[in-house]
Amino acid sequence: YMMGKYSKAAVLLAELISIMKGTDKAEESLFMVGMCYYGMGDNETASHYFTTYYNSYPRGVYAEEARFYTGKSLYMAVPEPRLDQTATVKAIKELQLFLEYYPQSDYSETVHNMLYDLQNNLAQKEYETAKLYYNLGPYTGNFNYASTSPDANANNYESCVITAQNALKEYPYCIQREEFAILIL
């Protein structure tokens, strides 16, 4: 582990966990397996091991670090804003839980910065959605539906404004604030 051979260390430490179950060595091994996967860049597996650690050892020696690295691993696994943001929401929840459990932690500032970035990801997704409505403009889709529907006068500009207004309410400190205001006008 100390030499950076994380894949070998992960295999050996995983075996130690089952052999040493119930001892301090199993606790340390479980945390170190998470760190191995984190070091290899396998963020989802790392977050799984860190979650297992703090659920198994809530008052363990590495409980604070495990919660932090769970959130950080999920943060690192977040997709770009144009994709599904379920992972972003999961990372936000985990980081907020960390702040609830450890408000005075040395990691607090880092966690706040990660939360800010994740909120901006969600705001960017909303901006792209509003921009799509704006670009669609008065397009109503199916001609037959448009001529027979009582909502035929409704258009995508209204959807753009509503999406932008909702995004400003939900993410008031986002970096896209000015762009949302332009779309609303």
What does each model-identified segment do?
Residues 1-185:
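Acidic, polar-rich low-complexity tracts and alpha-helical solenoid repeat scaffolds
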